[in-house]
Amino acid sequence: MDKKVIYLATTNKNKVKEFSEILKDYQIKSLLDIPEYVEIEENKKTFKQNALLKAKHLAKYINGVAIGDDTGICVKALNDFPGIYSKRWAYPLTNHYDICNKLLDKLKHINQLNKRKAYMTTAIALYDAINKKQFVYQARVNGYIDFQVNESEFGFGYDFIFIPKGYDKAYSLMNSELKNQISARKKAIDKLIEYIDNVK
């Protein structure tokens, strides 16, 4: 039996891979499959609003079901910066290591790990353009910002500097199975699956 297709409003291959690993019962397609699609500007004030904006815009375009995801890191000592600007605050830098190093520079005066508190958060929105239904949920994982960039073939974004609470290493030093069990994205997707199962 063919898997149900859900479109993901992203061109990020790493994000598509994570969603595919967690949502194994569905075929995940993304903006990489519809190159003519023009992404909408993320101009909202919260992670939830941005996620829903992306999901709704794509769902209406394909006249189907789409998921929007907005993920970021919030550093307590920086008043929750970069927050919703996590993806674009360091522009024109695009290399994940460079962006992480730039954030570390802002914390170089703080030399105690317990004073480098942060959290990773993911907001997930699903919009069904046919039935006009929507679901939005935000999850977070508390932790700390490491003192160095932990370069690795695993991970992306801020995985290289974020140590989840209760662990002694950054996401990038974990295998994908472990990260996918404890990440904010996994928590949010679990709630999404509950919603999907309940509306079948």
Curated annotation (Swiss-Prot):
In Gene Ontology terms, what is a biological process of this protein? purine nucleoside triphosphate catabolic process
- InterPro entries the UniProt entry points to: dITP/XTP_pyrophosphatase (IPR020922), ITPase-like_fam (IPR029001), RdgB/HAM1 (IPR002637)
Q: Give the reactions, separated by semicolons, that this protein catalyses.
A: XTP + H2O = XMP + diphosphate + H(+); dITP + H2O = dIMP + diphosphate + H(+); ITP + H2O = IMP + diphosphate + H(+)
Its cofactor is: Mg(2+)
Keyword list (alphabetical) reads:
Hydrolase, Magnesium, Metal-binding, Nucleotide metabolism, Nucleotide-binding
Is Hydrolase a UniProt keyword of this protein?
yes
Report the cofactor remark. Binds 1 Mg(2+) ion per subunit.
Q: Where is the active site?
A: D70 (proton acceptor)
Residues recorded as binding substrate, renumbered to this chain, are T10, T11, N12, K13, N14, K15, T71, F156, G157, Y158, D159, K179
A cellular component term (GO) from this record? cytosol
Q: Domain of life, per the record?
A: Bacteria
The entry lists its GO molecular-function terms as:
dITP diphosphatase activity; ITP diphosphatase activity; metal ion binding; nucleotide binding; ribonucleoside triphosphate phosphatase activity; XTP diphosphatase activity
Q: Which residues bind Mg(2+)?
A: E41, D70
Q: What is its EC number?
A: 3.6.1.66
- Which HAMAP family did the record assign? Non_canon_purine_NTPase (MF_01405)
Assembly description: Homodimer.
Family, similarity comment: Belongs to the HAM1 NTPase family.
Function comment: Pyrophosphatase that catalyzes the hydrolysis of nucleoside triphosphates to their monophosphate derivatives, with a high preference for the non-canonical purine nucleotides XTP (xanthosine triphosphate), dITP (deoxyinosine triphosphate) and ITP. Seems to function as a house-cleaning enzyme that removes non-canonical purine nucleotides from the nucleotide pool, thus preventing their incorporation into DNA/RNA and avoiding chromosomal lesions.
**Protein name, please?**
dITP/XTP pyrophosphatase
Source organism per UniProt: Mycoplasma mycoides subsp. mycoides SC (strain CCUG 32753 / NCTC 10114 / PG1)
Provide the organism lineage as a comma list.
Bacteria, Bacillati, Mycoplasmatota, Mollicutes, Mycoplasmataceae
